[in-house]
Amino acid sequence: MDSITPLPIALVTGASRGRGAAMAEALAKTHHVVAVARTTGALEELDDRIQAAGGQATLAPMDITNTGAMAQLCRSIHDRWGAIATWVHAAVHAAPLTPAAHLSEGDWTKSVACNVTATGILIPFLTPLLGTEGRAVFFDDPHAGEIFF
C-alpha cells in the first residue's frame, strides 16, 4: 500500500484473537488496519479474513511490552501515514482465574507488564498520532469484577 491512502488508519493492539480480532475485522470495512499482536500465525489468519472481505491491513507481529519495538512502530506509522484515526487497545494478559492469594508471581508480573506498564508507555507514544481528532478505545479483562472463589 502506498504511503497515501484514502482510508483512515486504525491501530489495533491485541489483534490476533478475541475482541481485538473482531474489532480489526470490523474496522477494516472503513479503515486501513495496523494489526499488532505477538502471534504471527494468528495475524496472518486475520489478514486473510480482512483481505477476503475486501479490506487492507498491515501486520506488526510484536509484543506491546517491547518498548523499543512499539516506539519504532509509532515512528513508522508517523513516517508512512502521519497519523491514526483510531487506536483500539485490546491487548491484555488475563491471568488464570484464581483467588488473588493463589496467583503466581510470574502471572502477576506479566499482567502488570502488559495491562499497566505497556499501556502507560503506549499512551504518550500514540497521543501525538491521534491528534485532536483521533479516538482511542480500551478493552479490559471480560471477567473484571467477578468473584473467583
Which residue stretches match the model-derived regions?
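Conserved glycine-rich Rossmann-like NAD(P)H-binding loop of the short-chain dehydrogenase/reductase
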Residues: 30-45
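The beta1-alpha1 cofactor-binding region of Rossmann-like NAD(H)/NADP(H)-dependent oxidoreductases
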Residues: 62-72, 105
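A short, exposed helix-loop element centered on a Lys and neighboring polar residues
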Residues: 123-124
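Conserved glycine-rich cofactor-binding loop
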Residues: 14-17
